[in-house]
């Protein structure tokens, strides 16, 4: 499972002009599910992101988590995070999970975040979405449950 995590001042996602999720302060999480991913990957990534210390403390050190600062999450499904662009000019998505499995694990990730008390806004799985965000910092992290960057 792979995530691009951005610290944001605010964000929202719309589908066909309707707001489906929003976050007034916290993290925007683009979440991709790989074909080898399991519920354990969803649990690992949820725990990692909720406790990731990328907010500044009083000494301006990145020492606080989204949970510590009372923020929320905006989670957007994004299979393109598993796009492989190494060959040719068209990305291959063969490493992305099939839609049914990806949706299940996406929902499991959201549930894991909710279970630890996080407020989570979401997009609509497989929908064409418009994501609006005001980045803070910017602070952007790449996290993968199976490999390092």
Curated annotation (Swiss-Prot):
Top EC category: hydrolase
Record motif Gly-cisPro motif, important for rejection of L-amino acids, residues: 137-138
Gene Ontology, cellular component aspect: cytoplasm
Gene coding for it: dtd
Subcellular location: Cytoplasm
Record remark: domains: A Gly-cisPro motif from one monomer fits into the active site of the other monomer to allow specific chiral rejection of L-amino acids.
CDD domains membership: Dtyr_deacylase
Superkingdom to which the source organism belongs: Bacteria
Protein keywords: Cytoplasm, Hydrolase, RNA-binding, tRNA-binding
Purpose of the protein: An aminoacyl-tRNA editing enzyme that deacylates mischarged D-aminoacyl-tRNAs. Also deacylates mischarged glycyl-tRNA(Ala), protecting cells against glycine mischarging by AlaRS. Acts via tRNA-based rather than protein-based catalysis; rejects L-amino acids rather than detecting D-amino acids in the active site. By recycling D-aminoacyl-tRNA to D-amino acids and free tRNA molecules, this enzyme counteracts the toxicity associated with the formation of D-aminoacyl-tRNA entities in vivo and helps enforce protein L-homochirality.
UniProt family annotation: Belongs to the DTD family.
Protein name: D-aminoacyl-tRNA deacylase
EC number: 3.1.1.96
Single GO term (MF): Gly-tRNA(Ala) deacylase activity
């Amino acid at each position: 499972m792979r995530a691009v995590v951005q610290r944001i001042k605010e964000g929202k996602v719309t589908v066909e002009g309707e707001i489906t999720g929003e976050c007034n302060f916290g993290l925007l999480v683009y979440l991709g599910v790989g074909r080898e991913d399991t519920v354990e990957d969803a649990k690992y990534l949820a725990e990692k992101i909720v406790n990731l210390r990328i907010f500044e403390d009083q000494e301006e050190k990145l020492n606080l988590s989204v949970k510590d600062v009372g923020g929320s999450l905006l989670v957007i499904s994004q299979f393109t995070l598993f796009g492989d662009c190494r060959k040719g000019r068209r990305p291959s998505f063969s490493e992305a999970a099939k839609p049914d499995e990806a949706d299940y694990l996406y929902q499991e990730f959201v549930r894991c975040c909710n279970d630890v008390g996080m407020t989570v806004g979401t997009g609509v799985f497989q929908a064409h979405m418009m994501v609006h965000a005001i980045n803070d910092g910017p602070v952007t992290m790449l996290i993968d449950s199976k490999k390092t960057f």
